[in-house]
Amino acid sequence: MPKLKTKSGAKKRFKVTATGKVMSAQRGKRHGMIKRTKKQIRQLRGTRAIFKTDGDNIKKYFLPNA
């Protein structure tokens, strides 16, 4: 059976760390920023770890070779 291909959209959105955690950018920074405080906008920078169960599903179905 051939290897599963990695989904190219997931390749751009998720990174798997050396310990196996799945990291992703924070949500909520595309539009509607005028109603957020400067502190809220600042705290949305960077990446966050995804919950373990969601991360396991991402690794299994979208990033099988990671």
UniProtKB/Swiss-Prot annotation:
Region annotated Disordered, chain positions: 22-41
What organism does the record attribute this protein to? Rhodopseudomonas palustris (strain ATCC BAA-98 / CGA009)
Name any one Pfam family assigned in the record.
Ribosomal_L35p
Q: What is this protein called?
A: Large ribosomal subunit protein bL35
Give the superkingdom in one word: Bacteria
* UniProt keyword ATP-binding, yes or no: no
Q: Where is the composition biased (Basic residues)?
A: 27-41
User: PANTHER family of this UniProt entry?
Assistant: 54S RIBOSOMAL PROTEIN BL35M, LARGE RIBOSOMAL SUBUNIT PROTEIN BL35M
**Family the UniProt entry places it in:** Belongs to the bacterial ribosomal protein bL35 family.
Q: Name one GO molecular function term.
A: structural constituent of ribosome
One GO cellular component term of this record is:
cytosolic large ribosomal subunit
